[in-house]
A protein has these predicted regions:
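Short, low-complexity, polar/charged sequence segments that are solvent-exposed and flexible
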Residues: 49-53, 82-85, 217-221
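A short, terminal or domain-edge coil/loop segment
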Residues: 45-57, 87, 103, 247-261
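Alpha-helix capping and helix-loop boundary segments enriched in small/acidic/polar residues
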Residues: 8-9, 42, 89-92, 131-132
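Intrinsically disordered, low-complexity Ser/Thr- and acidic-rich flexible linkers and loops
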Residues: 77-91
Length: 262
């Protein structure tokens, strides 16, 4: 049985640790419990689920199969939209509880890899301006990462779902695809005191292209970020960043808002 200090939230906002059991079977691992689920590049999902995951390695190819349950009280990308007919009301696509996925990653060379993930959410409830309906939603993700030089890496990934026909607060269709790219100098490691990383990323991430992506501030945002990670003591990371951009879809009847975070 394993657990770690990263926490998630269960029913009624009770804080719980990730906790799971795992067993090795040759070059494969079976994990059962509550654990962090991560698509190939974290564009579809990077959050905790309760279920089972089977991972394997075969030379330069690795992959995983997952089935689990998510907390269903939140929306895709954590995004809700004001109802133009009544701004006191909001609507969005609320998560189904069942999630399944298959992902693959292949090392093209010692410095370059490609990856892809297929994911499926059952019974997503779309509450659009008082008209509710349920549907299963499929997600796809593909990307690559490469080492350009010593201590300099580049990654880029694209994700898309088949949830369409939903409009935002100003009547535009909610975007169901998105892409994310990042250039990073060095890598910080929480166990390596003094390690650091400098990064910049640019993205255009539609709200319906992700369940819960790595770096929440990238969801439903078109723009760029400049940041810095530093490890002052073991298991402690300080991150400072500035991000700027605009919403991909308007969550307010006043239109798309600018996004500036420091």
């Amino acid at each position: 049985m394993k657990s770690d200090s990263i926490t998630a939230y269960g029913d009624k906002d009770i804080q719980v640790n990730k906790i799971y059991a795992e067993g090795n079977f040759g070059d494969s691992i079976l994990k059962i419990g509550r654990y962090g689920e991560f698509s190939s590049y974290g564009r579809i999902i990077d959050t905790e689920i309760s279920g089972a995951e089977y991972t394997f390695e075969a030379g330069d190819l690795s992959g995983a199969l997952t089935y689990g349950r998510l907390k269903d009280s939140r929306t895709l990308a954590g995004t809700t939209f004001e109802n133009p007919k009544d701004t006191k009301e909001t609507f969005g696509a609320y998560l189904g509880t069942e999630y399944s996925s298959a992902r693959l990653k292949y090392n093209l060379s010692p410095v370059t890899a490609i990856g892809a993930t297929y994911g499926r959410l059952n019974e997503v409830t779309v509450a659009e301006k008082g008209n509710n309906f349920q549907d299963s939603v499929n997600f796809w993700e593909a990307g690559f990462n490469t080492k350009l030089a010593d201590n300099l890496t580049l990654m880029a990934a694209y994700s898309k779902s088949d949830l369409d026909g939903v409009t935002d607060s100003v009547g535009s269709e909610v975007v169901n695809d998105g892409w994310f790219s990042e250039l990073r100098y060095k890598q910080h490691n929480p166990s390596d005191v003094g390690s650091f990383a400098i990064f910049t990323n640019y993205r255009n991430v539609g709200a319906f292209s992700t369940i819960d992506a790595t770096v929440d501030y990238t969801e439903n945002v078109r723009g760029w970020t400049l940041g810095f990670d530093y490890v002052p003591m073991e298991n402690t990371t300080i991150e400072v960043f500035y991000t700027t951009g605009t919403q991909v879809n308007a969550t307010s009847t006043e239109g798309r808002q600018d996004v500036d975070i420091f």
